[in-house]
């Protein structure tokens, strides 16, 4: 499965770009907000969500782990697939979504093309607890780690990623805290690499 692509934007279209990676072109679908930040001929790093079906493989790209996380979160709602999730993220940022759900503001979602009253109600109802957990977890992590350059939701994703790579939760949180204390503006990618490097050097 493809988790990340680093390459040059060869061409762009209404809902996807072709990313050239060492001469191989990958079609990557993305939200309008992400596509607006990608310029042809420039190189970018995209976090990838790979969807495999019997007749095709689709790649969905994101400039942040936070957007990728909400892409998957939205699809947990009955009636929302990849296309609708991207449509919502084309209009609303992850922070917008969190605020709307916390405020039970269905009208924010109803204003999006393809989202009717019933779907807007399901989004608020089905994601209420999940977003509340993200918000409380992110706030706790932000307070304990004093994060400056990385958003709270993204930091939570980093810790989850490290746990999936074999860290205990305690090890992951301590590793992130130590690294960010030394370099508050470190990128997410570099943060993960440094944590893995430090852990391997201790064995």
From Swiss-Prot:
<comment type="function">
    <text>The RuvA-RuvB-RuvC complex processes Holliday junction (HJ) DNA during genetic recombination and DNA repair, while the RuvA-RuvB complex plays an important role in the rescue of blocked DNA replication forks via replication fork reversal (RFR). RuvA specifically binds to HJ cruciform DNA, conferring on it an open structure. The RuvB hexamer acts as an ATP-dependent pump, pulling dsDNA into and through the RuvAB complex. HJ branch migration allows RuvC to scan DNA until it finds its consensus sequence, where it cleaves and resolves the cruciform DNA.</text>
</comment>
<dbReference type="InterPro" id="IPR036267">
    <property type="entry name" value="RuvA_C_sf"/>
</dbReference>
<keyword id="KW-0233">DNA recombination</keyword>
<dbReference type="GO" id="GO:0005737">
    <property type="term" value="C:cytoplasm"/>
</dbReference>
<dbReference type="InterPro" id="IPR013849">
    <property type="entry name" value="DNA_helicase_Holl-junc_RuvA_I"/>
</dbReference>
<dbReference type="InterPro" id="IPR010994">
    <property type="entry name" value="RuvA_2-like"/>
</dbReference>
<keyword id="KW-0234">DNA repair</keyword>
<dbReference type="GO" id="GO:0000400">
    <property type="term" value="F:four-way junction DNA binding"/>
</dbReference>
<feature type="region of interest" description="Domain III">
    <location>
        <begin position="150"/>
        <end position="203"/>
    </location>
</feature>
<dbReference type="GO" id="GO:0048476">
    <property type="term" value="C:Holliday junction resolvase complex"/>
</dbReference>
<dbReference type="GO" id="GO:0009379">
    <property type="term" value="C:Holliday junction helicase complex"/>
</dbReference>
<dbReference type="InterPro" id="IPR000085">
    <property type="entry name" value="RuvA"/>
</dbReference>
<feature type="region of interest" description="Domain II">
    <location>
        <begin position="64"/>
        <end position="142"/>
    </location>
</feature>
<dbReference type="Pfam" id="PF07499">
    <property type="entry name" value="RuvA_C"/>
</dbReference>
<keyword id="KW-0238">DNA-binding</keyword>
<keyword id="KW-0963">Cytoplasm</keyword>
<comment type="subunit">
    <text>Homotetramer. Forms an RuvA(8)-RuvB(12)-Holliday junction (HJ) complex. HJ DNA is sandwiched between 2 RuvA tetramers; dsDNA enters through RuvA and exits via RuvB. An RuvB hexamer assembles on each DNA strand where it exits the tetramer. Each RuvB hexamer is contacted by two RuvA subunits (via domain III) on 2 adjacent RuvB subunits; this complex drives branch migration. In the full resolvosome a probable DNA-RuvA(4)-RuvB(12)-RuvC(2) complex forms which resolves the HJ.</text>
</comment>
<feature type="region of interest" description="Flexible linker">
    <location>
        <begin position="143"/>
        <end position="149"/>
    </location>
</feature>
<dbReference type="GO" id="GO:0006310">
    <property type="term" value="P:DNA recombination"/>
</dbReference>
<dbReference type="Pfam" id="PF14520">
    <property type="entry name" value="HHH_5"/>
</dbReference>
<dbReference type="InterPro" id="IPR011114">
    <property type="entry name" value="RuvA_C"/>
</dbReference>
<dbReference type="GO" id="GO:0006281">
    <property type="term" value="P:DNA repair"/>
</dbReference>
<comment type="similarity">
    <text>Belongs to the RuvA family.</text>
</comment>
<dbReference type="InterPro" id="IPR003583">
    <property type="entry name" value="Hlx-hairpin-Hlx_DNA-bd_motif"/>
</dbReference>
<keyword id="KW-0227">DNA damage</keyword>
<dbReference type="Pfam" id="PF01330">
    <property type="entry name" value="RuvA_N"/>
</dbReference>
<dbReference type="GO" id="GO:0009378">
    <property type="term" value="F:four-way junction helicase activity"/>
</dbReference>
<dbReference type="GO" id="GO:0005524">
    <property type="term" value="F:ATP binding"/>
</dbReference>
<feature type="region of interest" description="Domain I">
    <location>
        <begin position="1"/>
        <end position="63"/>
    </location>
</feature>
<protein>
    <recommendedName>
        <fullName>Holliday junction branch migration complex subunit RuvA</fullName>
    </recommendedName>
</protein>
<dbReference type="InterPro" id="IPR012340">
    <property type="entry name" value="NA-bd_OB-fold"/>
</dbReference>
């Amino acid at each position: 499965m493809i988790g990340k692509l680093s390459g040059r934007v060869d061409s762009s279209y209404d809902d996807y770009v072709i990313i050239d990676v060492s001469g191989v072109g990958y079609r990557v679908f993305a939200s309008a907000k992400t596509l607006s930040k990608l310029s042809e001929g420039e190189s970018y790093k995209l976090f990838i969500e790979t969807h495999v079906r019997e007749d095709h493989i689709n790649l969905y790209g994101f400039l942040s782990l936070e957007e990728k996380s909400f892409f998957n979160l939205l699809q947990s709602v009955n009636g929302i697939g990849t296309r609708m999730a991207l449509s919502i993220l084309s209009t609303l940022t992850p922070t917008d979504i969190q605020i709307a759900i916390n405020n039970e503001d269905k009208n924010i979602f109803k204003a999006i093309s393809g989202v009717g009253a019933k779907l807007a109600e399901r989004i608020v109802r089905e994601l209420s607890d999940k977003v509340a957990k993200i918000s409380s977890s992110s706030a706790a992590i932000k307070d304990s780690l004093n994060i400056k350059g990385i958003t709270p939701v993204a930091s939570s994703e980093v810790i989850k990623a490290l746990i999936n790579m074999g860290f205990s939760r305690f090890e992951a949180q301590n590793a992130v805290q130590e690294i960010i204390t030394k370099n508050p503006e470190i990128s997410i990618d570099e943060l993960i690499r440094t944590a893995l490097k430090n852990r391997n050097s201790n064995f």
